[in-house]
Every structure is written in C-alpha cells, then in structure tokens.
Amino acid sequence: MSKEKTAFIPKQYFAVVAVLLAIMMSVLDGTIMNIALPTLAHDFDVTPANAIWIINAYQLVITMTLLSFASLGDIYGYRRIFLTGISIFVGASAACALSDSFWMLTVSRIIQGFGAACVMSVNTALIRLIYPPQILGRGMGVNAMVVAVSAAAGPSIAGSILTLGSWHWLFVINIPLGLAALVIGHRLL
C-alpha cells in the first residue's frame, strides 16, 4: 500500500469531522432526553406516560424514514440529503429549545427526527466517498466508534448539562455544532 494512496489531505479530515459531528448529534439526541424526562413532565404538567412521547416521536420518525432518505440519497446525492438533514436538525433544535409547551416540543422533536434520519441515512455513504478504499475500514471503524460513544455518553452529557442549566440547553448545544458541521460540509463534501 503506497503512502500517497492512503494519505489523507486536510480537506478530507475536515469533511470527516463534519460527518462525524452530525452523526454524533443525531445519536446523542436519541439518548440525551431520558435524563430530562422527569423535569419535562413536571414543567409541562404531563404524565410520565405522555412525556415519553418526546423521545418516542424522535425515534419513530427516524425508524420510519431512514430507508426512504437513503434511497433519496442515491437519487439526489448524498451531499444534498446530508446538508438538508443538518439544516432541518439545527432548525428543529432551535425550535425545541424555544418550546413552551409539550406539543410544541413533541412536534419539534418529530421535525428533528426527519433531520437526523437524513444524516444517518447517508452517513456511511459519505464516509465511503471520503476515505480511500485502502483505509475505508478505518473510516467505518471511526464512524462506528463515534456512534457507540455518543449513544453511551448521552445520559452522562445530559446530566452534566442539566446540573448547569435547564433542559433547553440540551437543544441549544446542537446549534453551534450543527452550524459548524453545515459550513464544513457545504465547503468540503
């Protein structure tokens, strides 16, 4: 394996950062809300059985649309679906942070789920396009590690954020990270 075929150029590193940031946020938001549910149920004066829909809405939308967005990525391009997904995700994160009712938060989470599904559906395809074939396994491994660590770290990150601020910050944190991924992805993917 020659060095020039497997060497990464800085542009590729930043493109990978954009993809990994986006998948990290999408996975984190699936697990980060568990810790906040009692607070949300209290703040919105809903039962715990109803509050769980804040999580379920997000997960159900991802599950129902993941394959459809992957197919759209094949048709319209992975980059377009990825950037659209990040845009939707960031906008919905802002709406979640500004939510003042249970229904507004749940609807915002549904919209956020559409953005996350866009990102998740084309994530590995973008990794495949960024990494040279000789080191594609490394790229897939890094991607899998980010997904696993994000899922496992979600409750701990949520607990840390909630000790410092309100539940709104669980969504506000997505905005600068998402905008960074959007700008980098727009320039380098």
Model regions and ranges:
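Transmembrane-helix bundle of Major Facilitator Superfamily
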Residues: S2-R187
